[in-house]
Amino acid sequence: MDASKLPLGSFVGTTLLLFILYKLVKLAYYVGQAKNTGLPYTIVPVLETEFLGKLLTPLIRPLFTSRLSRGKGWPRWIRFSILDWAWEEKRRVHEELGDVFLVVSSEGLICYTADADMSWDVMNRRNEFLKPRDKYKVLEPYGPNVATTEGKAYNFHVRITAPPFNDGSGANDLVWNEASDQARALMESWSQENTTRDLSLDINRLTLAVIAYTGFGKRLDFKTEVSDLRNKIPPGYKMSLHHALHLVTTFMVKILLIPKWIMKMTSMKEIAVAHGELEKYMREMIRTETANLSKDSEYQSADAKGNLLTSVLRASAFEAKAAGRKQAFSEDEVLGNLFLYLLAGYETTANAMTYGFITLALRQDLQDRIIQEVDGVYAEAAAEGRTSLNYTDDFEKFQYTYGFMYEVFRLYPGVCIITKMVPKDTTITVYPENNSPQQHVLPAECRVYLNVNAVHYHERYWPDPWALKPDRWMGTIGATPNARSNKKVVAGDKSRQVRGTLMTFSGGARACLGRKFTQSEYISALATVLREYRIVLGEGMDAKVVKQEIDHLAAGTVTLAPLKYVKLALKKRTDVKTG
């Protein structure tokens, strides 16, 4: 019978039946693959990576807010279908299914792992475990970068983007000084109003100002109001650089996920304009700095010596000369990496600092210890005739503060899942506790998701994992000389010894290049604030509720962020009774 003559109802029913059969056949195929691996597995109707999962997530999340805030996690029937479910689950699912297991649907397989040794192995085999293109393409709104490239392209990018973060480049000194300056501006602003403030807004302002200066050499006053950002538009532009930066960083998620042509047709038109204008500004800056360097290879910005833009262009020119080419990075590649610096240097750092400030407001005992250390470092500087701190002389002195920072990184990692995939059948090694290593073969196209939260909250690697203990980063090594170099071992050295057990900055062959840049900004800003003030909860904030919600809920941004409602206050240390 001619299909075109079938009744509509019969046609729809037949089509639906064929679709279901097609899905069942695919599911049976992938279940067979899962069985062949020898790993435990569970079957779900929809994976978090599928379009339907991404569509359902914003609709379903609000329905379970109360349950999630109590630390109950997701119901079993829905958890693997929710995008970024791992934060709310912590280790719960791995306690049920094991440290390494598969999730199977009709669209494929995902291998989730909370095995630190396996994770370390995966992160070091970067040519076998690749980044899924669909997950990382969104990080290229302006061009390819060191986070999205693979193989030879990655090697090329890292040769140019790594040198700007070395201590000798001046970038870490620059970010230390600018973070301290912006923190002082923050304190002045808070002290003048003498009230509780929107913490997330102020921390975001601070980190935006820091990355604008250290990234592009452009000064942004912390106290600049949003209304003022609209002024001073140069000829040929539709908005000021600062306004474009403000909009792009504020609406980063929309810019990464929504096509520009859709934004232009909706109420998000101004965001689309900011996206385009920021690109225009950055291209102009690239061309100006390139021209300056072509005249003088040792050129440095008079104000922002060591800024990332100039450093990347210089490294690119050096790479080109070494390879006998006219240029190394294209303009798009420079632009792509500048955007990555903006994303990491603004959003990731802002969220990490926000979690730190909230934690100190909740834990005055920790704040006491950090203040004691801050005062001690300032006293040492004064004995040397210095009135201020700097990166070179003082960064490594903040042992307890460093430990606190890393505990915040552990408990509230910016990225909850590190995503990989295998392009061909690949052997993995699983390391069960108290058992011999076991090998399993993952089929081609299987995704491998390193569950950062499940590792960071794993008692096998972190005794009493829910407790924030800065001392765990120090122990006896903080005061023990290194026998080979006679150099004092600092807490930072221990962070390099926990292979695979701390993945805030990823790890292995593709560890974050800017981790020390972030650490410098974090400690500088915190030390500057705590030199004069204490951080306390704002009026009306319930400490128990705040703690419960920062541990179990998130704002749903590009990286992990707390809910926006938390209010804090700065109080002069002399005005706050402790003990």
UniProtKB/Swiss-Prot annotation:
Gene3D superfamilies: Cytochrome P450. Induction: Expression and the subsequent production of PR-toxin take place under static culture conditions (oxygen limited), whereas no expression of the PR-toxin genes occurs under the strongly aerated conditions required for optimal penicillin production. There is a negative control of the transcription of the PR-toxin genes by the penicillin biosynthesis gene product(s), or by a regulatory peptide encoded by a small ORF inside the penicillin gene cluster. Signal peptide: none annotated. GO terms for cellular component: membrane. One of its GO terms (molecular function) is monooxygenase activity. Pathway: Sesquiterpene biosynthesis. InterPro entries: Cyt_P450, Cyt_P450_CS, Cyt_P450_E_grp-I, Cyt_P450_sf, Cytochrome_P450_monoxygenase. Its EC number is 1.-.-.-. The chain crosses the membrane at residues 6-25. Cytochrome P450 monooxygenase; part of the gene cluster that mediates the biosynthesis of PR-toxin, a bicyclic sesquiterpene belonging to the eremophilane class and acting as a mycotoxin. The first step of the pathway is catalyzed by the aristolochene synthase which performs the cyclization of trans,trans-farnesyl diphosphate (FPP) to the bicyclic sesquiterpene aristolochene. Following the formation of aristolochene, the non-oxygenated aristolochene is converted to the trioxygenated intermediate eremofortin B, via 7-epi-neopetasone. Belongs to the cytochrome P450 family. This is Cytochrome P450 monooxygenase prx9. It comes from Penicillium rubens (strain ATCC 28089 / DSM 1075 / NRRL 1951 / Wisconsin 54-1255) (Penicillium chrysogenum). The gene is prx9.
